[in-house]
Amino acid sequence: MTLLTTEIRRARASDAAAIAAVHETSWIQAYTGILPHRALQAMVARRDVAWWTRAIRQSTRVLTLDIGGHVAGYATIGPNRVKSLPQGGEVYELYLSPQYQGLGFGRKLFLAARQDLRTGGRPGCLVWVLEENAAAIRFYENAGGRDVAEGSETFDGRTLNKIAYSFD
């Protein structure tokens, strides 16, 4: 029997390749059929190893979920970008490699991200979800999120609605 340890920690530059791989596989799984194909491919290609290295070294707060010493997921967090909403923090992204989804690891990473925001003086948090992403909506509603705002984003000429979920 093999015992795998899990750890959530701040990302290091040496994690960039693993995070880029998680980003690619999880985004393709999550957004194929939702985002226009070309837009999705361009967004994935833009987030290469060099991009993640810069993000980690600069001001972006990136947390990783390590399982058995390998990066299985990541979250990016920071200040709430919508000043008309009172929440102090925002989870910009939270993604896991597909083989780790549905096992409770996403919830663990999400709770750690929220705790990191609180500890950093950013109480309350927002998460924006595309309205067509049923799996993400189910995840955040099951985590206790309240639908507090709506917006839209345009990808390669296609406008998609998004929902903001609030967490205390």
Regions found by a protein language model. Give the residues of each.
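Terminal substrate-recognition subdomain of acyl/acetyltransferases
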Residues: 2, 162-168
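Acetyl-CoA-dependent GNAT
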Residues: 3-6, 10-16, 21-99, 107-116, ...
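Conserved hydrophobic beta-strand within the GNAT/NAT acetyltransferase core sheet
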Residues: 91-94, 125-129
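Active-site acidic-Proline motif in GNAT/NAT acetyltransferases
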Residues: 97-99, 103, 131-132
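Conserved beta-strand-loop-alpha-helix junction that forms the acyl-donor binding cleft
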Residues: 127-137, 154-159
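Conserved active-site tyrosine of GNAT-family acetyltransferases
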Residues: 140, 145
